[in-house]
Structure formats: C-alpha cells, structure tokens
Amino acid sequence: MFCVQCEQTIRTPAGNGCSYAQGMCGKTAETSDLQDLLIATLQGLSAWAVKAREYGIINHDVDSFAPRAFFSTLTNVNFDSPRIVGYAREAIALREALKAQCLAVDANARVDNPMADLQLMSDDLGELQRQAAEFTPNKDKAAIGENILGLRLLCLYGLKGAAAYMEHAHVLGQYDNDIYAQYHKIMAWLGTWPADMNALLECSMEIGQMNFKVMSILDAGETGKYGHPTPTQVNVKATAGKCILISGHDLKDLYNLLEQTEGTGVNVYTHGEMLPAHGYPELRKFKHLVGNYGSGWQNQQVEFARFPGPIVMTSNCIIDPTVGAYDDRIWTRSIVGWPGVRHLDGEDFSAVIAQAQQMAGFPYSEIPHLITVGFGRQTLLGAADTLIDLVSREKLRHIFLLGGCDGARGERHYFTDFATSVPDDCLILTLACGKYRFNKLEFGDIEGLPRLVDAGQCNDAYSAIILAVTLAEKLGCGVNDLPLSLVLSWFEQKAIVILLTLLSLGVKNIVTGPTAPGFLTPDLLAVLNEKFGLRSITTVEEDMKQLLSA
C-alpha cells in the first residue's frame, strides 16, 4: 500500500504516505492496492478512447463510465474491494469493445501505452492485490526522485478531482466532447509514467483549465434543472417527525428522494455538502425538506449515531459506520461503498423510506436556529455593483474567500479564528464544507449586505471566480488587483483540482492550510510559491495583517 492523496496521510521523517495495513482514512491495504489496479485499467481504457477518437469513434458508455469509476478511488468514497475489482473488470470489457470498434475500421490499430492491454490475472482478491504492486504510484521513486513523483501525483489527484465533477455533471445530463477528449488524453498520458518536470507542470495547468470548463457545465446542469440559488434561511435544529438524512453532492438523488417521500410523513434533512441544496427553488419547494443536520463530515460517527432515521450517502465523504453502530441504517448510492452496508443500485429509495417509517424519528421540535445559504452565481453577480459601491464609499475594505474542505486536525480551528477575526468592514465569501467551522456564528451585515455569504458547494468556486472576473472588469483591473484574498482549506482531490483551476487562471497569493499536501516536496512548494505566490497559513494575526496590507 502507498497512498498520499489526502490531508490526513501519515507523515514521518522517512517520508509521507500511508503504507501499512490500513490508511488513516480507514481504507485497507487491499482496497488501496486494488484502487491502483483499477486506475491502471482506466488508463488503458483512456488510451483506447484517444485512439478511437482518431477514427471518429466516440463511445458514450466509455465516456460516462471512466470518470465515474475514477471517482470511486477518491478519498472517503468506496472502501468495498469487490466493487473496486468490478469496476476494473468493466473497464477492461469496455476497452476490449472499444478496441474491436477501432480494429473494425483499421485492422492495424495499435496503442503504444503500457496499460493498453492490461488483464486481471486472477479472480482471487489476494492475487489481484499482488498484481497491483506493479502499479503502486511510488514504484519507481528511486529512479525518478521525489519531485517528479510529487508532480505525477499532483496531476493524477487533480484529474481525479476533475473526474468527480465530470460525474456530478453527467448525472445532470451534461456532456462536452472536448472535455472528455481532454480527460482521456491526460489519463492515458499519466499511464505512461511520465518523468519530464516541465511536461508535468504544464499538464497540471491543463487539468486546471479543463476543470474550469467542467465546473461550468456542472453549474449549467444544476441551475438548469433546479433553478438559480437565491438566499434562503435553513433551520439547523430538529423538527418533530420521522426522518431521512442525505449527504454528499448529488442534487439529483436529493430531488428523487424528495419526490418519493412527499406525502409519506417523512422529513428530509441535508448533511455536509448537501446544505446548499436549500437555495435551489426546485428543491426547497418541497416543504418536507425541513433543515440541515450536523456539522463537518469528520464528525459523522457521533452525529449519525444520534440521528433517529436512515442515512443516504450519495458521494464523498463516508467513514466507518460500525464505530457508531449505525451501519444497519446507512445506505450508499452510485460510486459510494462500504463493506456490509446496503447499496442502492438505482434511484428507488422505497427501502430507505420504509426503514424511516419504522423508526422513531425526532420526538419533538427544537427551537429553530436559522442560517442563510443560496448566494449562487446569479445572486452574486447581481450584487457586483453593490460591492463596488461599498468599496468606493470605503464601507467595504476587503473580501475574504474563506472556504474549502473540513477535516479532523486541531489546527483547523485556524479557520474559525480567522473568520471571527475578520474586521467588521470586511466580507467573508465561503463555500464547501470548510464553512462548518463558522457558518452557525453571527457576522452581521454591511448596509444590509450579509458579512457571511455562502456561495455553495466546493464546485461553486466557479461562481466565485465569475464574480471576481466581473468585479475586475467593472473596475478595470486584474483579478489579482482586487481587494480580495483567498484563504483555502484542503483535504482531498476535489480541493486539489480547485487549486489547480485557480492557478491556471492566474490567481495569485493564495493562502492554504492547515498543512501542505504530503506529495508536494519542499522544492515543489518553492516553485509554486515563486510562480504563483502560493503559501501555507502561519498565524491568524500575521496572515490577516499581510492580506489586508497587500
């Protein structure tokens, strides 16, 4: 086992990365190794997808499957080894079908890629784990060095984050052939074990640029189906009655659940990154979408244990449900998996609803506590002139984009302290689950404009980027000249690709924490600092002083 893709990876003087019987996320060595094997099969599939496009062949089954299966290897998504192997077998079957299509056009069709003809050597998980050793990401570290390995992983993990957003967009009916062609090209190239530093740096920026397009179609999918989010108050306390909790990012799953629970007497609560759903008109119209439950994903083992109903996980993040003994009432959807937990293959939630009706639910309603969400792209752009006016009248000094992933490290209290230290004449724009560090606190307003503005999920960084570009255009300056600072928390691969997106767009002087990614060496961090001004957090006082004086 070697895995260094998330923030909680083991760090030692000898090197970074989980390499024992189990990773810090709870992923076993078996599952981790089989995920490496799956990725290798997906690289072979992408190699043939690139070749097929040379013949004008576009296989939509391949295009929809490849990013989805890659997504299953993202942190805290799928811990179920047999399902990982199932994805690998499906990848090979699709590859062989695509290969046959190519050979039908050109009998001499060949692909020069070491993964192009990979076969699974056994049906036994132990044997497959031994085969997977050929594809462990650091297998040639001694030959290439830590810097090349770090850049490879930056590209691989960034592309994995983009694949997750591609799957979210695909579920909503969004497809862009150029994006998929680019994805396959990069995925196939990474399967050749590239070792050129400049090429890898260029690839990381290409991934960021591609992801901007992915976020654009995801935004179109969400707003096209569910309307543009508008500011909405959400209750974060319990309402009496039977209940279901839904977590993750998949708004379509939430919509289907709301439709199927309507009139059943079962209330629905959002959790984690599903919180922004309350801002969408076509979702909040369901009166039994009664509120948001819990806090950051890392607290789920305590909070889910207390929730008196079933729980549905639509995407990341899931952690061991046996710890809180709720594994008999947590359900996984799509690419999510945990051994022994019931999985919903389709969009029928009747079994979950039946379980909710058999449980007690909340016995009474708590005193409501309302927070505001729903500052989507359209709302943000509508406020652009107001923001400019406030700046011109010196009522608004600075905007801080304070968002990203949450996690368990104690150092993450930095983000709470930073938020509460932001001066009264400054505004906080937030997104992703890092907001749970401060989104239930009161921040007041500036002439009626809330000082805490929740822009949505991690992918809604797109909205923040569009706002920044719009403000810069109206003010006749560059984005980096705005009174705007980005203070981002990271945990997994979606955050990595958001960072690459921002860097590829030329955004500079981003501050990140609580730690640097374990796969980025001091040399690579120095390059990113020199080229983009990217740096790690220090103290709230020092960072606030520096950012306000910039």
UniProtKB/Swiss-Prot annotation:
One BP term from GO: response to hydrogen peroxide
A single Gene Ontology CC term: cytoplasm
Predominant subcellular localization, coarse grouping: cytoplasm
Keyword Ribosomal protein: no
EC number: 1.7.99.1
Residues reported to bind [2Fe-2S] cluster: C3, C6, C18, C25
Reaction(s) catalysed by this chain's protein: A + NH4(+) + H2O = hydroxylamine + AH2 + H(+)
Enzyme class: oxidoreductase
Binding site for hybrid [4Fe-2O-2S] cluster: H249, E273, C317, C405, C433, C458, E492, K494
Modification Cysteine persulfide occurs at: C405
Any one GO molecular function term: metal ion binding
Pfam families: Prismane (PF03063)
Annotated family: Belongs to the HCP family.
Function of the molecule: Catalyzes the reduction of hydroxylamine to form NH(3) and H(2)O.
Name of the protein this chain belongs to: Hydroxylamine reductase
Organism, as annotated: Escherichia coli O6:K15:H31 (strain 536 / UPEC)
